[in-house]
Amino acid sequence: MGRMHSRGKGISSSALPYKRTPPSWLKISSQDVEENICKFAKKGLTPSQIGVILRDSHGIAQVNSVTGSKILRILKAHGLAPEIPEDLYHLIKKAVSIRKHLERNRKDKDSKFRLILVESRIHRLARYYKKTKKLPPVWKYESTTASTLVA
């Protein structure tokens, strides 16, 4: 799938392992993995950061193969899931930082243009998440209140 606002084609990606069973050398039980996920979520880490930590320091390549469910599902089951989906949150964070930059540098036309692109991506993602009921139907992105969503 191509990029939305650039020329890149986005071809390269990592290949998922063929075996869906946990490796034989992995001695951690699924309950231990769930406890670790909850512990990291309480520290304030995002689901992707939790996955990176589990992969790098605990040797768990795919949480789904060990526990049978994905990180976000485990977080939802324990009531620790973020209220705004992670990709939307990071786009809002980017828009807030560009807006802050534009307050200091009013003549930066390129940043103004990039802000328009980022905000259009935010609106598109929000529409998708409302359709799939991951966001409430009355949720709306407003640039004035965006900094409170990120903080």
Swiss-Prot record:
The cross-references to SMART domains, in alphabetical order and at most eight, read: Ribosomal_S13_N, Ribosomal_S15
Entry keyword set = Ribonucleoprotein, Ribosomal protein
Q: Which Pfam families match?
A: Ribosomal_S13_N, Ribosomal_S15
Q: Enumerate the Gene Ontology biological process terms.
A: translation
GO function terms (MF aspect): small ribosomal subunit rRNA binding; structural constituent of ribosome
Task: Show the PROSITE patterns listed in the entry.
Answer: RIBOSOMAL_S15
Origin: domain of life? Eukaryota
Q: Which GO terms describe its cellular component?
A: cytosolic small ribosomal subunit; nucleolus
UniProt entry tagged with the keyword Phosphoprotein = no
Please verify whether the record's keywords include Ribonucleoprotein: yes
Record family assignment: Belongs to the universal ribosomal protein uS15 family.
Name this polypeptide is given = Small ribosomal subunit protein uS15
